[in-house]
Regions:
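Residue-level marker of positions within ordered structural domains that often coincide
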Residues: 6, 59, 152
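Short beta-strands and strand-coil junctions in structured, solvent-facing domains, enriched
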Residues: 7-10, 65, 170
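Active-site phosphate-binding and catalytic loops of NTP-dependent enzymes
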Residues: 9-14, 31-33, 40, 156
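Interdomain "pre-motor" coupling segment immediately N-terminal to P-loop NTPase/helicase cores
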Residues: 1-18
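Short loop/turn motifs enriched for small/polar and acidic residues
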Residues: 4, 104, 168
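Conserved P-loop NTPase nucleotide-binding/switch module
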Residues: 111, 118-123, 127-129, 137-196
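Phosphate-binding glycine-rich loops and their immediate beta-loop-alpha structural context
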Residues: 21-86, 92-144
Length: 196
């Protein structure tokens, strides 16, 4: 073992605050997504529905409406405005954000597209965790859980992390298929156990 959570083994002293012991606070600082004048999607988000540090946001979209383009614009905006400390950037920001793209049940082409976008935008500093649509449901849920745990470890180290998850619906379906049934069914065919 050479590194633990990205740190050399020698520097790991075992002293860290557990994620569960951290305080949750209301967002008080905005994440600016706007970059250039020709990219309007992130500017509209900043004006109409700003996203703050510590906030959760949801993009609801019908198929073929441009959700993937919006996700890529959000990733690019965060990478430009809040580059990681070791990443070279022209923007001098007090904060840096580590980007994690988590893709559940995606087509392989979409995974490649997002992977390239994250690498290009972050200088290969961001992470992509993905499961393809043809993988078993248990593997799809495992990818999401591992990514969440990785993000928690980074937050415990004092980093700001943004998880871009595509898609919550496919994640819920994977849990619905992977978990044993309770015998009850909610609207949409979901088992209540899959939602908790």
């Amino acid at each position: 073992v050479e590194k633990v959570n990205g740190e050399p083994v020698e520097s790991v002293n075992g002293e860290r605050v557990s994620f569960d012991d951290l305080l949750a606070v209301y967002p008080d600082a905005q994440i600016n997504l706007s970059t250039t004048k020709d990219i309007l999607t992130t500017r509209v988000i900043d004006l109409i529905s700003p996203i703050g540090f510590g906030q959760r946001a949801l993009v609801v979209s019908p198929p073929k409406a441009g959700k993937t383009w919006l996700i890529k614009d959000i990733i690019a905006g965060i990478a430009v405005n809040y580059p990681e400390r070791s990443q070279k950037s022209k923007v001098k920001s007090q904060k840096s954000i580590h980007i994690m793209a988590v893709l559940i049940g995606e087509r392989p082409e979409e995974v490649t597209d997002i992977l390239r976008k994250v690498r290009d935008a972050t200088g290969e500093m961001g992470e992509v965790a993905a499961s393809n649509f043809d993988e078993p449901a248990a593997d799809q849920t495992r990818v999401g859980e591992l990514a969440l745990e990785r993000a928690k470890r980074l937050v415990e180290k004092g980093m700001d992390v943004v998880i871009v998850l595509d898609s919550v619906t496919r994640m819920a379906r994977a849990y619905n298929m992977a978990l044993p049934t309770s015998g009850r069914t909610l609207s949409g065919g979901f088992d209540p156990v899959a939602l908790f």
